[in-house]
Amino acid sequence: MASPVQVNPAGTLAQQALASAPEGMLIAPVWRRASAFVLDVLALSLLMHLLTGQRLLLTLADTSYLTGGPRFLASWAFSWALFMTGFWLYWKYTGRAYHRSLGQRAFRIALVHDDGTLLDDHHWGPRARSKLRYLVPVVGWFFAVRDLLRARSPGAEHRTAIDRAHHTVAAVDWSLPSETRIGLG
């Protein structure tokens, strides 16, 4: 029969959650994570804007398309679909190629499992889809602020909701074991 009393190991919840992490692995600071995300969004938005003849961002921001009739509404909806699909593809395939986005690479952030190993290819599609919530105007800001506050909290194991859902940790890349660093792009 199991005892009704359970003895937990010492340490904070964050220390217990990351107990399987390699010794010396550092969690990436929130400011780096936010800056990497902003860099990704600015760079890819600008690239897509230029590739669409400088119309994409103007169409996304123009709410008069909603009242201009079905043709304008379809154009507005297509622009949002193109915008979201572009980001999903970017995060999915840079994750598969480099095990992080280019913004995360610039800020020396690596996304790894709790034990410090690299993510497999099948993790990047769902993770990219989860990050799209931050791009939705107004609602995305709520999710972003909530997750940034969670990522600063030891009680939330210094993880965002996406990290917790996908069992990942955002670590500083130079603090990872050498066999993990070799696999990073």
Predicted segments, located by residue:
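Hydrophobic alpha-helical transmembrane segments in multi-pass membrane proteins
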Residues: 41-53, 83, 87, 135-140
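Short, charged cytosolic
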Residues: 2-22
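Alpha-helical transmembrane segments of integral membrane proteins, especially early/N-terminal helices
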Residues: 2-6, 35-51, 183
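Juxtamembrane cytosolic face of transmembrane helices
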Residues: 25-35, 41, 90-104, 118-185
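Alpha-helical transmembrane segments of integral membrane proteins
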Residues: 31-36, 74-83, 126
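Membrane-helix interface segments in multi-pass membrane proteins
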Residues: 48-84, 153-154
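Juxtamembrane inter-helical linkers in multi-pass membrane proteins
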Residues: 105-115
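Membrane-water interface of alpha-helical transmembrane segments
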Residues: 23-26, 70-77, 127
